[in-house]
Amino acid sequence: MFELNPNRKLYRDTLLDSDVFIIDDFYDNPDEVKDYLEHPLPPLWKQDIKQLGRHGNNGFYFEDRRLQDHNLDLMKVYDYLSILCDQPPAGRNDWVQSNMTRFIDDEYNTYDTCHWWPHIDYGYNGIVYLNYDGCNGTNIYDVVSRRELQERPADEHEEPWRDKSRYKVMKELIPKYNRMVLFDGTFPHGMNISNDRFFNHDYRINQVFFFKPDK
């Protein structure tokens, strides 16, 4: 199922001397991968924070669903991406992870004035976009207000919309069906929700991969 397309197209870009890889026509059977990721419907992510007495908005103003699974067929994909970014996987090399997100049409979701939860990860991130959409990809940021990362809530579901004045978009990664982007996740980054494409009905669906330096 996770066979790489032998005719995939690899492009290389840079951001502050860091390589950014864009691979079009990534999977040989992307429809099969998408069906695997979304059926059955994955559970809402981080619902356990309610048991800890903390407030989360997942399931109320938006749905953030994640599949966490393992599939040995994915090992060769991790190997390929690991060679490109020169970093080993952050976890097991058969780890299947997805992001499925949609929003409720409510004034809470202020995509016109806010960015969705810019954050950092251990190392390189890989994202395969699985929607026919050319707008709502991934932004890479510079943080204009250094106090922002210190003062905002620790959990992404408490106050995920962050004022645009606190961040500068350094690079926009454009989505395309069956496109893989591989970039340095130590730069602040997040979903670029730029319109209401994923409000009420359709989910924004992608598969994600995480890597980290081995030092």
Question: PLM ranges: what are they?
Answer:
Residues 105-215:
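Catalytic core of non-heme Fe(II) oxygenases with the double-stranded beta-helix
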